[in-house]
């Protein structure tokens, strides 16, 4: 039996307030949410129907010049120098004059980059001590899943979690989000971002988005550039694909006429453009994702897919997944837009508040130590049957 | 208002870090060691992530005629300088470890790498 109303809201109110702080990679997000106290939550598995009200969802991204990734030290500096300003902005937007009214402060405990995680948890601890509010440490992946479930209303979907640092196919079973398949090396977003660096295209708003726009401009969609297709059972590998397409791009820029895939050996005519490479890379990678997702759906006998994570807002991925689901009986794809797909504070608040409402929160500051490695299936999901 | 201070303690040395509010290094929120990394700046990065400037109180001090910073801004400036002091001290220690100048230093490095200083 799950009781989401186990801990009453502060001040005998009829709603909960939570603030979420996210900073596991180059996005710094602060979100404030409100959950009404609903009778149906006293004895039910309705954690995807919290009637959440988003009071503020502020995000600031650390952007580097074209061709460059984000270094931990500089990303941490960005978070350190912006966190107070972003929290103030979120409180103003949420019209919260007295922050001590907030029920719980939620922060990302991991997985992610060490230095940025540290900066954000220090802010969370300070607020907790200053306002005397309990803390909840949230697994970043679980944050994505819970936000996706709440926004889309997907009850028990197979989750495809695709971002710059993670690629996992997940399904819920017996109080855990179990990982059915995952990347064996780099994440899909990392693969796309690093290819964007090779192409030296801008990192704003995000490198993956710019690849998607280039892919849309491909004029040769019926003829894909053949790339390695590396599905290994339920897992996938993307580092080899990246290496291969990087070499093709470099040959293209150097005009290496010896490369017969790119140039006609007799006339020297260019056969492939940068747009073609972007399109083929996307098609190849997304086809791999669709394959393992479909297999996971068959395993758990589910007809719902929920796509979360930054790469999840790629429209082409959503289209391909929808096509697969259409071919299966009554399949549905659930996805969210960039407000919730891309890392944000609201998702941390959502997962953290669910945990808080079931009576789990930090009892001692030693429990707030952040960790770079924190697998999705390590979290006990107390708020689901 | 008492001034912030820090102490480094190791098995072989200790170091005290004190703040001198009259020294210009404790009168800014832009630290020398807490800026964007040189590598990123060389790649043409426009630094838009600087810390905010210290805030002045609304009223100018009637006795001195000099602007006063808010208590919190004073603390931020002092901590920035203190952080610089700590970073420089630790960097110096690391450089010392990186470049042995004689056999005695080399021995020290080996001891450090063995983790013997920690025991």
Curated annotation (Swiss-Prot), chain A:
UniProt keyword annotations, A-Z: Activator, Acyltransferase, Cytoplasm, Metal-binding, Nucleus, Transcription, Transcription regulation, Transferase, tRNA processing
Cofactor: how bound: Binds 1 divalent metal cation per subunit.
EC number annotated for this UniProt entry: 2.3.1.234
Annotated binding of substrate, by residue: 161-165, 193, 208, 212, 314
Main location, first listed in the record: cytoplasm
Xref: CDD domains: ASKHA_NBD_OSGEP_like_euk (cd24132)
GO biological process annotation, one example: tRNA threonylcarbamoyladenosine modification
Subcellular location: Cytoplasm; Nucleus
Residues annotated to bind a divalent metal cation: 140, 144, 161, 343
GO molecular function, one term: N(6)-L-threonylcarbamoyladenine synthase activity
Family to which this protein belongs: Belongs to the KAE1 / TsaD family.
Function comment: Component of the EKC/KEOPS complex that is required for the formation of a threonylcarbamoyl group on adenosine at position 37 (t(6)A37) in tRNAs that read codons beginning with adenine. The complex is probably involved in the transfer of the threonylcarbamoyl moiety of threonylcarbamoyl-AMP (TC-AMP) to the N6 group of A37. KAE1 likely plays a direct catalytic role in this reaction, but requires other protein(s) of the complex to fulfill this activity. The EKC/KEOPS complex also promotes both telomere uncapping and telomere elongation.
Protein name: tRNA N6-adenosine threonylcarbamoyltransferase
Gene symbol of the encoding locus: KAE1
From Swiss-Prot, chain B:
Bias (Basic and acidic residues): 44-58
Subcellular location, principal: nucleus
InterPro entries: EKC/KEOPS_Gon7 (IPR014849)
Location within or outside the cell: Nucleus; Chromosome, Telomere
Gene Ontology CC annotation, any one: chromosome, telomeric region
Chain residue ranges for the region called Disordered: 1-62, 97-119
Pfam families per the UniProt record, alphabetical: Gon7
Amino acid composition bias (Polar residues), ranges on this chain: 25-36
Superkingdom in the source lineage: Eukaryota
Any GO BP: tRNA processing
UniProt entry keywords in alphabetical sequence: Activator, Chromosome, Nucleus, Telomere, Transcription, Transcription regulation, tRNA processing
Amino acid composition bias (Acidic residues), ranges on this chain: 108-119
Family: Belongs to the GON7 family.
Subunit organization: Component of the EKC/KEOPS complex composed of at least BUD32, CGI121, GON7, KAE1 and PCC1; the whole complex dimerizes.
Job description of the protein: Component of the EKC/KEOPS complex that is required for the formation of a threonylcarbamoyl group on adenosine at position 37 (t(6)A37) in tRNAs that read codons beginning with adenine. The complex is probably involved in the transfer of the threonylcarbamoyl moiety of threonylcarbamoyl-AMP (TC-AMP) to the N6 group of A37. GON7 likely plays a supporting role to the catalytic subunit KAE1 in the complex. The EKC/KEOPS complex also promotes both telomere uncapping and telomere elongation. The complex is required for efficient recruitment of transcriptional coactivators.
Protein name according to UniProt: EKC/KEOPS complex subunit GON7
């Amino acid at each position: 039996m799950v009781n989401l109303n186990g801990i009453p809201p502060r001040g005998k109110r009829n709603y909960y307030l939570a603030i979420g702080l996210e900073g596991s990679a180059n996005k710094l997000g602060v979100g404030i949410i409100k959950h009404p106290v609903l009778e149906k939550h006293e004895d039910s598995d309705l954690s995807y129907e919290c009637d959440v009200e988003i009071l503020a969802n502020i995000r600031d991204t650390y952007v580097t010049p074209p061709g460059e990734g984000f270094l931990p030290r500089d990303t941490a500096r960005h978070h350190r120098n912006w966190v107070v300003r972003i929290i103030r902005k979120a409180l103003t937007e949420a019209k919260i004059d007295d922050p001590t009214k907030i029920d719980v402060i939620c922060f990302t405990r991991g997985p992610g980059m060490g230095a940025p995680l540290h900066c954000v948890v220090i802010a969370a601890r300070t607020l907790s001590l200053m306002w005397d509010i309990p803390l909840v440490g949230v697994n970043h992946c679980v944050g994505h899943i819970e936000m996706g479930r709440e926004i889309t209303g997907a009850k028990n979907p197979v989750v495809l979690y695709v971002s710059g640092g993670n690629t996992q196919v997940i399904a819920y079973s017996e109080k855990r989000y179990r990982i059915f398949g995952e990347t064996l090396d780099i994440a899909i977003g990392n693969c796309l971002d690093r290819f964007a660096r090779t192409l030296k295209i801008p990192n704003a708003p995000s490198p993956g988005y710019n690849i998607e726009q280039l892919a849309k401009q491909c004029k040769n969609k019926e003829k894909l550039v053949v790339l390695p297709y590396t599905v290994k059972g339920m897992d996938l590998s993307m580092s080899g694909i990246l290496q291969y397409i990087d070499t093709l791009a470099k040959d293209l820029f150097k005009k290496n006429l010896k490369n017969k895939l790119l140039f006609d050996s007799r006339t020297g005519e260019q056969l492939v453009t940068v747009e073609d490479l972007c399109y083929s890379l996307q098609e190849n990678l997304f086809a791999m994702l669709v394959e393992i997702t479909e297999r996971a759906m068959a395993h758990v006998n589910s007809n719902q897919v929920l796509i979360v994570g930054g790469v999840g807002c790629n429209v082409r991925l959503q289209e391909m997944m929808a096509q697969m689901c259409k071919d299966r009986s009554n399949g549905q794809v659930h996805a969210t837009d960039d407000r919730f797909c891309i890392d944000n504070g609201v998702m941390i608040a959502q997962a953290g508040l669910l945990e808080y409402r079931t009576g789990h929160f930090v009892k001692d500051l030693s429990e707030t130590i952040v960790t770079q490695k924190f697998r999705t299936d390590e979290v006990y999901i107390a708020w689901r049957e | 208002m008492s001034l912030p201070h820090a102490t480094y303690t190791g098995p072989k040395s200790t170091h005290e870090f004190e703040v001198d509010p009259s020294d210009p290094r404790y009168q800014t929120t832009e630290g020398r060691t807490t800026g964007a990394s040189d590598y990123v700046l060389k790649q043409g990065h426009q630094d838009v992530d600087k810390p905010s400037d210290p805030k002045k109180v609304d009223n100018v001090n009637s006795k001195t005629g000099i602007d006063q910073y808010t208590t919190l801004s004073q603390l931020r400036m002092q901590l920035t300088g203190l952080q610089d002091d700590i970073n420089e001290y630790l960097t110096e220690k690391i450089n010392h470890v990186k470049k042995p100048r004689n056999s005695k230093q080399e021995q020290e490095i080996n001891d450090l790498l063995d983790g013997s200083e920690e025991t």
